[in-house]
A protein has these predicted regions:
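Hydrophobic transmembrane helix bundles of membrane-integrated enzymes that assemble
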Residues: 2-35, 101-290, 401-495
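Extracellular-facing segments of soluble proteins and assemblies that are Gly/Ser/Thr-biased and enriched
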Residues: 108-141, 364-392, 575-614
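Short linear, low-complexity motifs centered on an aromatic residue
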Residues: 362-379, 487-497, 552-555
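Transmembrane signal-anchor helices characteristic of membrane glycosylation enzymes that use polyprenol
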Residues: 12-77, 260-271, 509-510
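Small-residue-rich helix-loop
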Residues: 377-398, 404-412, 440
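Membrane-proximal stem/loop segments at transmembrane-domain junctions that anchor or position
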Residues: 49-93, 273-383
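Collagenous Gly-X-Y triple-helix signature in extracellular proteins
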Residues: 514-696
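Sec-dependent N-terminal signal peptides of Gram-positive bacterial secreted proteins and lipoproteins
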Residues: 502-510
Length: 696
């Protein structure tokens, strides 16, 4: 009997606790072992820092480097007790917005004050590590609860759950958010706590567990205010918890807890600041509905807006004032646009134009490939550098292209949704004979499937294509959860069926890597070896566009500028690179007039265009609106792929793209080895793929 009790303790308590401890250690190590890593500021930190009385320690550029150290603005930084009290103060002079997220930031401030007192540092010093520790602790607790839920399952299932949690949900793509002031880390950890409490309720329902569940739901809703509609649906569907037990006291407790949760979530909605609603509405219309529309004026009239605002199509809410073709700060625009267009109008517009909605959703799905936001950096020292620490799942999910292939996602979601509709009809029809636990399980799956659809549609309807990759984080998270459920179900299957499904999955994945052989040409020499080129296409004048099959060198783009016309890489390609070409080879090369995009700071050199090119990292959208962006021309014998030609080029390793990152004048675009087009400092080394145009 004693041995049985000891085994029960080990499986029921000790192993889950050890699992949670491993999650904590791994998470902390990913962020702080070796170089400290996190996420740089994309501009969103400002409002969080202001509201919580925190500021940067210096005036250096923080947009592309992860920053660990800040300064707290404390009313009484000389007194320990006064500093503790001041750490919980909110900036009442700046009513930017309110969020439950601030509670965690204030708690991290208190931890910093205590640590500073112990270490002898200035009480006002702020290290974001303490905020990360809070998130790591929440993730570890959620992991421990999830491991506990499976403590009575087979060893095979327990090992599978543990490995999936470590490999997928402790991936750097998720953990990097912990070292930032974004709302996503609270969203992520609150979602994991929500799942954990949901599992506890499934096993042994009680009011305290329900309180934990609905508290996690409240923080999930408040972490990103766009989560509020989904959170309300979750709260209403979670009424199924009431029927898990029959005693009246339990049911009353659940109803009261759920009611308080709904009231608090609704209060979050009522406190959404008007500026946030205005900006997102602007972007949903002008960087969403009308962005690539061929009927802009008709679209605006359908929304109840004057067609005079048609020139604003393709603009966003955070441009310089002189970049707008129409002044959007006037009272006339306030009445003519902001007072007329609501989010419901945008939703109904898409319902009446489902083909256009599907098109936008396809772009959204493609933007869900990365877990970490591809527009911000991870390093403290190298601008726009991505860490490779513990990024196995990030790498694999990009390689598994079906996870962000639009038609695969749509077909899968539709089939799963139809199956869940069938299951709901079945359980409703047989509600008298089915157990509450099984109904609860079906309801939990309903919540997940609804989350997939809602979090696919919400970013487009509520904010257009603005910052789309980052706004797809919750959708990506839900897809990963569904994938983990699928892998777990696969492990449960009989071995023969498991092997058959794995073989079919491998074959299906392989279909995405089928690439027809390209015609190759041998021309010129480099380092004494003949150069092999791939034919891209034949142009209208009969000349052929070629690109080197492999990188011909690895070097910085330039030592300071992202302008192609004055770059070091352009000079090298048109001098040293050609030095081993024979006269006959050179005579085959045709001088090419290239249209080059320009950074915003270089617009005075533009020969055309009326805006800086907007950033995107997918092949389908990377050149979007490039035809109207600032540009000039150069003539080159040898050049590099640009944003228009990258979609036709094979990818084996990173290589520079002949286009700047237009938000500044010291970063350039490059093709990552996974087929996405990113950006980095021009002083970093990347591969070079030469392009030429030759006579046939």
């Amino acid at each position: 009997m004693a041995n049985l009790t000891e085994k029960s303790f080990v499986r029921g308590r000790l192993i889950p606790i050890l699992g949670a401890l491993i999650v904590f250690i791994i998470s902390f190590s990913v962020l702080y072992m070796g170089e400290n890593v996190g996420l740089s500021d994309n501009g969103d930190f400002r409002r969080v820092l202001i509201m919580n009385n925190i500021e940067y320690k210096d005036d250096t550029n923080h947009y592309y480097l992860f920053n660990e150290n800040y300064k707290m603005l404390l009313d009484n930084s000389d007194s320990f007790s006064g500093a503790i009290v001041s750490s919980w103060q909110t900036n009442d002079e700046e009513e930017i917005y309110k969020s439950p997220h601030f509670m965690f930031i204030k708690l991290s401030k208190t931890l910093n004050v205590i640590a500073n007192k112990i270490s002898g540092n200035a009480l006002s010093d702020y290290n974001i590590m303490y905020l990360a520790i809070l998130y790591i602790f929440m993730l570890s607790v959620a992991a421990g609860v999830i491991f506990t839920f499976f403590n009575e399952s087979s060893v095979k299932i327990q090992i599978t759950i543990f490995l999936l949690f470590i490999f997928i949900f402790c991936d750097a793509g998720y953990l990097l958010y912990f070292n930032s002031f974004y709302g996503e880390p609270l969203q992520y950890t609150a979602l994991m706590m929500l799942i954990a409490f949901g599992m506890l309720i499934y096993k042994r329902p009680s009011v305290p567990k329900a309180i934990g569940f609905f508290t996690a739901l409240y923080f999930f809703a408040g972490s990103k205010l766009a989560n509020i509609p989904y959170s309300l649906i979750v709260a209403l569907l979670s009424v199924i918890i009431v029927f898990m037990r029959k005693d009246r006291l339990y049911r009353v407790g659940i109803i009261i807890t759920a009611g308080l949760c709904v009231i608090n979530i609704i209060s979050l909605y009522t406190e959404i600041p008007e500026w946030m609603n205005r900006d997102t509405t602007y972007q949903a219309v002008f960087l969403g509905i009308t962005k690539n529309s061929k009927t802009v004026e008709k679209d605006l009239e359908e929304l109840g807006v004057s067609k005079e605002y048609a020139p604003l199509a393709g603009t966003h809410a955070y441009m310089e004032k002189d970049e707008y073709p129409i002044d959007i700060t006037t009272e006339e625009f306030e009445k003519g646009f902001y007072e007329k267009v609501k989010k419901t109008d945008i939703a109904f517009f898409y319902l009446k134009h489902p083909i256009r909605l599907v098109g936008e959703l396809c772009h959204a799905i493609e933007n869900s490939a990365y877990i970490r936001p591809p527009v911000v950096g991870n390093s403290e020292t190298v601008p726009m550098e991505f860490t490779k620490k513990f990024s196995g799942w990030s790498k694999i999910r990009v390689s598994l292209r079906f996870l962000y292939e639009p038609w695969v996602i749509f077909v899968s979601f539709i089939l799963i949704t139809l199956y869940m509709i069938f299951m709901n009809v079945f359980y409703i029809h047989n509600h008298k004979i089915e157990s509450p636990a099984r109904k609860y399980m079906v309801c939990a799956l309903d919540i997940l499937i609804l989350g997939l659809w809602i979090n696919l549609v919400m970013p487009i309807v509520c904010n257009g294509e603005a910052d789309l990759a980052k706004h797809m984080f919750l959708f990506t998270n839900c897809v990963d959860i569904l994938f983990a459920i699928g892998i777990t179900a696969l492990v449960v299957c009989p071995i023969k069926r498991t092997l058959a499904i794995m073989c079919a999955g491998a074959l299906f994945t392989g279909l995405f890597y089928i690439d027809l052989p390209r015609k190759t040409v041998t021309l010129g020499r480099l380092n004494g070896e003949p150069l092999e080129w791939e034919k891209i296409r034949t142009l209208e004048d009969g000349t052929e566009l070629l690109v080197t099959k492999e990188c011909v060198g690895f070097m910085p783009y330039d030592d300071e500028s992202n302008a192609w016309e004055i770059s070091d890489v352009r000079e090298w390609l048109n001098t040293d690179f050609l030095s081993e070409f024979s006269v006959a080879d050179r005579e085959l090369i045709v001088m090419t007039k290239n249209r080059n995009l320009l950074a915003f700071n270089q617009r005075e050199r533009a020969e055309g265009g009326n805006h800086a090119h907007y950033w995107n990292f997918t092949k389908s959208l990377v050149y979007d609106m490039g035809d109207t962006a600032y540009y000039n021309y150069t003539e080159d014998m040898v050049f590099m792929p640009n944003l228009m030609s990258v979609k036709d080029i094979s990818v084996e390793e990173d290589f520079w793209v002949m286009s700047p990152y237009t938000a500044n004048d010291y970063m350039a675009r490059y093709m990552n080895d996974d087929g996405f087009i990113l950006h980095t400092d021009v002083r970093n080394e990347k591969g070079v793929r030469a392009m030429i145009r030759i006579k046939r």
